[in-house]
Amino acid sequence: MKLYNYSINKILLFIFSLSTLSSQTYWVKYGWEVFKSAGDARILSLGGSAVTDFGTSVSPLFNPASSNRVGIHNFNYTHQNRLAGMINSDLIGFQIKSYSRPLNLILMHEGIDQIPDTRNILLDFGFDGVPGTGDIGENNGLLDDGERLDENKIKYFSQRQIGFHLSTAWEKKSLTYGLAVKGLNHNLGEYSAFGVGIDFGLLAVPWKNGHIGLTVKDISTSWLVWDSGTVERFKPTLISGISHTFNLKSSPLTLNAMGDLMWDLSGKSFDDDLKFGN
């Protein structure tokens, strides 16, 4: 039985490696937006400091180590409407307590409708504006003098992203460790893709009312495989945060001071994407 499982794993690894080598693979920075914009108003306002937050079923999305600090009856639903209704997103988060180790599940959806497709509206007939004459500028893919755009050829398509985030956490000595597996189904017009990734988190309480958190998103380099054979890969992002709660003796209010530091390994420029393949 062990030999059988070992053989199956070797075969699957070989097929996966072969499919990767036979397709175009890109290092990119965009593609998992539904995970970056998800959250409720409270936790999104914390920015990177959200890695120190805990107590709700949305918190593990920012730091998986908070998965064991969610109330058993905690259920979150969030709806976002952005860019005058063009972008709509939903999030549902809840704790699963039926296992020996706590699990937290978050389901996400983001959709954009009525995206104009203008790829085929150029009447690329050249300077004379007459098709088939072979004059200068004909079929060069540029809008030249004498050419025009046909608005009747504008088509519209939609984009849909559906994702899940399943996390757990465990304590060892003075640290809490967290691990999350996430998946994404991305539909863009007539194209579709599926991706997987892993997040890792740490949470510590080094002093009274103080918290330090660390999250490594896409620690295994996440993948997004399109039905065309193109593979998009995403580099890890490191986010660290620190927070302290001040209890005001003369007032029932509390004051939270927070700070964060982010290191995005994908870089900052728009033209530094790398490509390898055949």
What label would you give each PLM region?
Residues 24-278:
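Subset of outer-membrane beta-barrel
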Residues 1-25:
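Bacterial Sec-dependent N-terminal signal peptides
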